[in-house]
């Protein structure tokens, strides 16, 4: 079902998307001689750890900077290394999106492999909920897709999808897949039901995007700063002070019954602290109005 969702020949389940990322990258370093990982500077910790633990050479390219990525690809070619571009579709802290088409064009130009993390996109984008690649109509242009069953699908676990031979090779050498307990039939059944349900209910994705637009509009109207790069369902409200962000989060919960997680260093840089909001299709207009009103008061009351 996951392979079908991503229009790939094969898929492989892991205990989490973190484990899937980490051990797939480690496995690729064992399978492909002379591989070099070209990693976006804002990649998730699981991707970073996978690259570090692989002991393969790496090059870090400036976030979403295609000129820098191309320079790294040229360098990899000059060293006779096999490049694997590692990036995400939706970045969870800023709520921005990678220039996926441009990345794929560069990959084609330099013969690079592509590995994309769609954790914050699966279930939420695309005709059937397969993510940003499906929404752009380019599922065939990325080699390996990583996704999660624990966010939009609301269950547990992670996976990769890709070419059958590549997935079989990863299955054979990824210790994080081989030497751990498999997902239980109950969890698999729940995930399968959720995947099928979201495939058949695109109106939920449409409703979520509508509620996100309403929230951003209302926040802008009252002068609450949203990260300027945010263009997805992730709405980062900028606070820029760790202690204040924590106090604001506490007051929202204690005084208004609204839980919003404060995001501090090392997840984001010092001075970039924020409250991260992700509206769902089931957050009503009244709930959004209450949230904005509460945020406006908390920004005034909490120093």
What are these regions (language model features)?
Residues 16, 38-54:
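Substrate-binding/gating loop at the entrance of the active-site cleft, primarily
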Residues 205-216, 220-257, 265, 271-272, ...:
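Conserved PLP-binding catalytic core of the aspartate aminotransferase-like
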Residues 2-23:
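Short loop-beta-helix segment that forms the pyridoxal 5′-phosphate
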């Amino acid at each position: 079902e996951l392979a079908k969702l991503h229009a790939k020949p094969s898929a492989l389940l892991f205990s989490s998307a973190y484990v899937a990322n980490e051990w797939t990258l480690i496995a690729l370093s064992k399978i492909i001689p002379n591989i070099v990982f070209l990693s976006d500077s804002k990649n998730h910790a699981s991707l970073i750890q996978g690259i570090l633990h692989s002991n393969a050479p790496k090059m870090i390219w400036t976030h979403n900077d295609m000129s820098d990525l191309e320079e790294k690809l040229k360098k990899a070619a000059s060293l006779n290394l096999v490049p694997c571009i590692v990036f995400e579709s939706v970045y969870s802290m800023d709520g921005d999106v990678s220039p996926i088409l441009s990345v794929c064009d560069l990959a084609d130009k330099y013969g690079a492999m592509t590995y994309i993390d769609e954790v914050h996109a699966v279930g939420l984008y695309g005709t059937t909920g397969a993510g940003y690649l499906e929404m752009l109509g380019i599922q065939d242009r990325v080699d390996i897709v990583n996704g999660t069953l624990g966010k939009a699908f609301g269950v547990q676990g992670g996976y990769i999808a890709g070419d059958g031979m590549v997935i079989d090779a990863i299955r054979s050498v990824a210790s994080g897949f081989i030497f751990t307990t498999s997902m239980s039939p109950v969890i698999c059944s729940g995930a399968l039901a959720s995947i099928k349900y979201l495939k058949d209910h695109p109106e939920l994705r449409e409703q979520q995007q509508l509620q996100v637009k309403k929230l951003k509009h209302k926040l802008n109207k009252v002068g609450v700063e949203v990260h300027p790069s945010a263009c997805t369902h992730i709405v980062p409200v900028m606070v820029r002070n760790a202690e204040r962000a924590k106090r604001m989060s506490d007051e929202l919960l204690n005084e208004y019954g609204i839980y919003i997680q404060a995001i501090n260093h090392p997840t984001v840089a010092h001075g970039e602290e924020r409250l991260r909001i992700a509206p769902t299709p089931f957050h009503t207009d009244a709930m959004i109005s209450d949230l904005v009103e509460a945020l406006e008061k908390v920004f005034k009351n909490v120093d």
